[in-house]
Amino acid sequence: MRHSLAAIPAAFLSGLAVAALADDAHTIIQNGRAFHPVEVTINHGETLDFSNQDEFIHQIYVDTPGLNYDSAEQPPGETFHIAFPDAGTFSVRCHIHPKMLLTVHVK
């Protein structure tokens, strides 16, 4: 019994560490050939998770001074992650659906 009680604080602290890491990520939903939301503000060093909840493939790219990113094709149900290490304003688009636009403000 003493052994399992000792594990409780460690498990609790481990859970807190995971929760703290999760706070650094923000989820962007791809649905209806659009990003949701269409604009987001984050801190430098944070990550955006792009979750494809559409019925078709997307291909995310960022081509802004300070950050270049081009994903592979992103099938429905998959998630890609983009880190934004520096401050600035970035445009995220989809190669396949050029009207898709997300503006990312990084502080």
Question: Language-model features: where?
Answer:
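Sec-dependent N-terminal signal peptides
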Residues: 6-13
